[in-house]
From Swiss-Prot:
Species: Citrobacter koseri (strain ATCC BAA-895 / CDC 4225-83 / SGSC4696)
Subunit structure of this chain's protein: Part of an enzyme complex containing four subunits: a flavoprotein (FrdA), an iron-sulfur protein (FrdB), and two hydrophobic anchor proteins (FrdC and FrdD).
Keyword presence, Cell membrane: yes
Listed GO MF terms: succinate dehydrogenase activity
Protein name per its UniProtKB record: Fumarate reductase subunit D
InterPro entries reported in the protein's UniProt record: Fumarate_red_D, SQR/QFR_C/D
Gene encoding the protein: frdD
Length: 119
């Protein structure tokens, strides 16, 4: 018999953030590591392409703030979601694990938003 009043799950929201963070971490983050972590220190950028003034101006624009926010928050949600499910798979039961991991991700998201807005 089908339950006429099924309990709604909040899991699709967290899986969505997990998937978005995973895609961001697989596509965008490696490019940023290559550009900023390898090519920039080796001096392979033309002229002042990534000078302090240009990077600061980008970081203070709306697009730059959104990019920095997503660069921090999406992989954070992905990692904490993965940790939550890894603990479950390893049969390590954290009391109120969903609240611990997703709560920490939410708190760090707010901290990141405050940090990004004060640049």
């Amino acid at each position: 018999m089908i339950n006429p009043n099924p309990k709604r799950s909040d899991e699709p929201v967290f899986w969505g953030l997990f998937g978005a963070g995973g895609m961001w971490g697989a596509i965008i983050a490696p490019v940023m590591v290559l550009l900023v972590g390898i090519l920039l220190p080796l001096g392979l950028f033309p002229g002042d392409a990534l000078s302090y003034e240009r990077v600061l101006a980008f970081a203070q624009s709306f697009i730059g703030r959104a990019f920095l926010f997503l660069m921090i928050v999406l992989p954070l949600w992905c990692g904490l979601h993965r940790m939550h499910h890894a603990m479950h798979d390893l049969k390590i039961h954290v009391p109120s694990g969903k609240w611990v991991f997703y709560g920490l991700a939410a708190i760090l998201t707010v901290v990141t938003a405050i940090g990004i807005l004060t640049i």
